[in-house]
């Protein structure tokens, strides 16, 4: 895989010690870091492996390959983690001992202005693709979706109460542009009158989150990865997942509690009881960053860490 030459800077790994403890690393074991990024977690895992140990690192972003570990115990997989099961089968792994997922968007993505993940600069194109070779970008969604579809997107993925008004304003604004909405600045202008100055950063973050989730099918990929993890882990293997917003955390919480990303409805629970989970939850409540880490690494502020062991 060809890697661009420019230097790549990623985030400091969040809750590194807690993740390593959660994985309960066997030096001779096989592990997967499905969100390789800058390689911070992976480097720490490899340091605990013997010459017999193995680590696979997944990342769909071409930039991540610049950080690949030059270690014979490590294999980089340039793919979306939704294909975890496919690649474990390809590499002949009949069971792994631990899987780590840090679901946060790296600071690298926000700092690379041309990727369009951040609203801090108005000039970039609205891209937001984690894999730049993948399908449609955020601009295509904003220009092609009707008001109803945009409203649903903002409501479900951004949890925005004014989703309908935002969608209507975007549709109205894009019709005034000969080339449609293309840049971050144009999107900001389209929604400016609907956002309270006091909550501007929070509401813009929710808008951009909703678009990013849609562009990359993040929740669909997460569901596939979780289901694959259950099949790939050996009995006694550990799943360690770090989430950064309520949509992800709810899916992970349900999956560990019920074995499915959607909780059973009340009627099913009343009639049949809760389904038996294939997981023993090591953390009944999610772990959060220490006061010191919050001070040293602001990115850890919204992180929630859940750990479970396959029964």
UniProtKB/Swiss-Prot annotation:
Catalyses: cytidine(1402) in 16S rRNA + S-adenosyl-L-methionine = N(4)-methylcytidine(1402) in 16S rRNA + S-adenosyl-L-homocysteine + H(+)
Q: Give the source's domain of life in one word.
A: Bacteria
The similarity comment for this entry is: Belongs to the methyltransferase superfamily. RsmH family.
GO BP: any one term? rRNA base methylation
* Protein role: Specifically methylates the N4 position of cytidine in position 1402 (C1402) of 16S rRNA.
Pfam families listed in its UniProt record: Methyltransf_5
Q: Which GO terms describe its cellular component?
A: cytoplasm
| Broad EC category | transferase
Q: Which GO terms describe its molecular function?
A: rRNA (cytosine-N4-)-methyltransferase activity
Keyword hit for Flavoprotein:
no
User: Which compartment or compartments is the protein found in?
Assistant: Cytoplasm
Q: In the Enzyme Commission scheme, what number(s) does this protein have?
A: 2.1.1.199
Task: Name the InterPro entries on file.
Answer: RsmH, SAM-dep_MeTrfase_MraW_recog, SAM-dependent_MTases_sf
User: Can you tell me which residues bind S-adenosyl-L-methionine?
Assistant: 39-41, 59, 87, 102, 109
Q: What does the UniProt keyword field contain?
A: Cytoplasm, Methyltransferase, rRNA processing, S-adenosyl-L-methionine, Transferase
Major localisation = cytoplasm
Q: What is this protein called?
A: Ribosomal RNA small subunit methyltransferase H
Is rRNA processing included in the keywords of this UniProt record? yes
């Amino acid at each position: 895989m060809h890697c661009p030459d420019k230097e790549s800077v990623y985030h400091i790994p969040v809750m590194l010690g807690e993740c390593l403890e959660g994985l309960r690393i066997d030096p001779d074991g096989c592990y997967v870091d499905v969100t390789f990024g800058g390689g911070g977690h992976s480097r720490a895992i490899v340091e605990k492996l013997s010459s017999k140990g193995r680590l696979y690192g997944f990342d769909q972003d071409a930039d991540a390959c610049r950080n690949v570990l030059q270690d014979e115990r490590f294999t980089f997989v340039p793919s979306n983690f939704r294909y975890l099961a496919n690649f474990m089968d390809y590499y002949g792994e009949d069971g792994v001992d631990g899987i780590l997922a840090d679901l946060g968007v790296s600071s690298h993505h926000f700092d690379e202005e041309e990727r369009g993940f951040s609203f801090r600069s108005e000039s970039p194109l609205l891209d937001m693709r984690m894999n730049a070779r993948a399908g449609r970008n955020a601009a295509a969604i904003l220009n092609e979706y009707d008001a109803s579809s945009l409203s649903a997107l903002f409501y479900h993925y951004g949890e925005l109460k004014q989703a309908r008004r935002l969608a209507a304003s975007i549709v109205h604004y894009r019709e005034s542009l000969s080339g449609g909405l293309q840049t971050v600045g144009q999107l900001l202008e389209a929604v400016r009158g609907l956002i309270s100055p006091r909550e501007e950063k929070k509401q813009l973050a929710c808008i951009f989150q909703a678009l990013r989730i849609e562009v990359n099918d993040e929740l669909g990929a997460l569901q596939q990865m979780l289901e694959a993890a259950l099949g790939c882990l050996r009995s006694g293997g550990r799943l360690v997942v770090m989430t950064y917003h309520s949509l992800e955390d709810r899916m992970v919480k349900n999956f560990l509690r019920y074995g499915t990303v959607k909780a059973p409805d009340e009627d099913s629970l009343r009639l049949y009881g809760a389904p038996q989970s294939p997981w023993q939850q090591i953390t009944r409540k999610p772990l959060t960053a220490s006061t010191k880490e919050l001070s040293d690494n602001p990115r850890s502020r919204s992180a929630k860490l859940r750990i479970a062991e396959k029964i």
